[in-house]
A protein has these predicted regions:
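Extracytoplasmic gate region of multi-pass secondary transporters
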Residues: 18-68, 161-165
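Helix-to-loop junctions at the C-terminal end of transmembrane segments
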Residues: 72-84
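Cytoplasmic membrane-interface "Motif A"-like loop-to-helix N-cap segments
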Residues: 81-93
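C-terminal ends and interior cores of transmembrane alpha-helices
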Residues: 93-108
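Hydrophobic core of transmembrane alpha-helices in multi-pass small-molecule transporters
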Residues: 111-127
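A late C-terminal transmembrane helix in Major Facilitator Superfamily
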Residues: 142-174
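A membrane-interface helix-boundary motif in multi-pass transporters
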Residues: 168-187
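Multi-pass alpha-helical transporter architecture, strongest
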Residues: 187-212
Length: 212
């Protein structure tokens, strides 16, 4: 038995930790879509579907990104205190509630209002983003930790993150409704929220070598 070949970690993740992998994908899909829509797609959205000039659109996003870099530290500290599950679910609910109001604010093409809208979305995104790395590392045991975290991240980013801008643009072009990116963000958050409600658990505070 001592010479028995170890099972490949990828096979082991799909065999024994499917529920945790699903939870990892759900948490990361909110992050992937939120990150690409809020921090990379919005300058294009603002110049293509509102009357905002490119320089102002980029300025608003730059300000939001700088603020985001500061906000995320506070969200990470809060996550250590209240737990990953609560933070991830709060982010889902916040995106569902705030996405349409924020995109309505973007539609004004007023620089101060656009900055406020982007800051609101950045705070919401930070509630998720500050948790992802820790949540994925904490949910898998040592034997599959790297593989489980990598699979969760890459599946979510390839399927949802990499296509976010394309889907948002396609939905607007198909419907003529400039709020479609908000509806897409809401749908992603709703699906992820349901999955996380039933699959997410808090592992922070448990030594990593004791997670099974």
């Amino acid at each position: 038995e001592g010479n028995k070949e170890a099972e490949h970690p990828t096979h082991l993740v799909f065999k024994k930790y499917r529920k945790r992998l699903l939870s990892s994908v759900a948490a990361t899909m909110v992050n992937a879509v939120g990150f690409y829509l809020v921090l990379t797609y919005l300058p294009t959205y603002l110049t293509s579907y509102t009357s905002m000039e490119a320089s102002q659109a980029q300025l608003a996003t730059d300000i939001a990104l700088i603020a985001y870099l500061l906000i995320i530290f506070g969200s990470g500290t809060l996550s250590d205190k209240v737990g990953r599950r609560r933070m991830l679910l709060t982010a889902c609910v916040a995106f569902i509630v705030l996405s349409i109001p924020c995109f309505l604010m973007l539609g004004t093409a007023s620089l101060p209002i656009v900055i406020v809208a982007e800051l609101i979305m950045c705070v919401t995104l930070s509630l998720n983003d500050a948790n992802i790395a820790c949540y994925q590392a904490e949910m898998f045991p040592t034997e599959v930790r790297y593989t489980g975290a990598a699979l969760g991240s890459n599946i979510a980013y390839v399927v949802f993150g990499g296509t976010a801008s394309f889907v948002a643009t396609a939905l607007i072009d198909a419907t003529g409704n400039g709020l479609m990116p908000a509806f897409y963000m809401m749908a992603i958050s709703a699906v992820a929220g349901v999955i996380l409600f039933f699959t997410a658990h808090d592992y922070n505070g448990i030594p990593l070598d004791e997670i099974r």
